[in-house]
Curated annotation (Swiss-Prot):
Family of this protein: Belongs to the sesquipedalian family.
Other facts noted in the record for this chain: Was named after 'sesquipedalian', an unnecessarily long description of a simple thing.
Region spans: Disordered: 134-189
Gene of this entry: Pheta1
Lineage top rank: taxon: Eukaryota
Name listed for the protein in its UniProt record: Sesquipedalian-1
Lineage, highest ranks first: Eukaryota, Metazoa, Chordata, Craniata, Vertebrata
Species the sequence originates in: Rattus norvegicus (Rat)
Gene Ontology CC annotations of this record: clathrin-coated vesicle; cytosol; early endosome; recycling endosome; trans-Golgi network
Keywords of the record: Cytoplasmic vesicle, Endosome, Golgi apparatus, Phosphoprotein
Predominant location: other
Length: 234
């Protein structure tokens, strides 16, 4: 893997918060002693410096595919960072105290992306279980026929509603005019001329009443039937 040294140096010393930092004893090669170095953990990258005030790291350890375990060593509070594969040598480190040892082991064990993926997967499963068992996510109407009804768009986005659609109310028809009192259904058939004369008399009678010319007028209901209808002035 090729890494940009300048980018790594900037990332190691930037002002962003670190996941863990402190002094650890790092063992060198075979037969070499341990050196006290300043370690900084950012994400899945472990930097180590010669001192806390150093601006450039001495080395970088990429924490992917590794395991962190306690080891028996001449240093107290020692642990090792091991990688899969026989060619990769373990990094043996030692803390100053038991609390520092536990803090570093916990932080390094949780630094890899593999661990983060497992955590995200577990959280997704818990969230899905909470959503399935939460009554707040149920629809207001338990009727299985209830469907989401699309509403007109607002600002280019469709607004949906889980409430059942209210039935449309048909407009009322205008009231029918009152029927005239007539016995035409039972009486003899009336010609068009007779109907014209009858309704003409009614119209003239109403006009005269409106003008105040007449007080009453007898209008035959059916011409030739002998029956009459009296209209009184209101």
């Amino acid at each position: 893997m090729k890494l940009n040294e300048r980018s790594l140096a900037f990332y190691a010393t930037c002002d962003a918060p670190v996941d863990n930092a402190g002094f650890l004893y790092k063992r060198g090669g075979r037969g070499a002693g341990s050196h006290r170095r300043w370690f900084v953990l950012r994400g899945n990258i472990l930097f180590y410096f010669e001192s806390e005030s150093s601006r450039e790291p001495l080395g970088v350890i990429l924490l992917e595919g590794c395991t962190v375990e306690l080891v028996d060593a001449r240093e107290e509070f020692a642990f090792a960072v091991r990688f899969a594969g026989g060619r990769s040598r373990p990094y043996v480190l030692a803390a100053d105290s038991q609390a520092a040892l536990e803090g570093w082991v916990k932080a390094l064990s949780r630094a890899s992306f593999h661990y983060l993926r497992l955590v995200v997967r577990e959280l997704e499963q818990q969230l899905a279980a909470m959503r399935e068992g939460s009554p707040a996510n149920a629809l207001p109407d338990a009727n299985p026929s209830t469907v989401l009804n699309p509403k007109p768009k607002e600002n280019g986005r469709a607004v949906w509603s889980a409430l059942p659609e209210q039935p449309a109310v048909a407009p009322r028809r205008p009231p029918l005019p009152p029927r005239r009192r007539a016995s035409a259904a039972n009486g003899p058939s009336v010609s068009f001329a007779q109907l014209h004369e009858r309704y003409g008399l009614e119209v003239r009678a109403l006009r005269n009443q409106w003008r105040g010319g007449l007080t009453s007028l007898e209008v035959p209901c059916h011409p030739g039937s002998g029956e009459t209808q009296t209209q009184d002035q209101p």
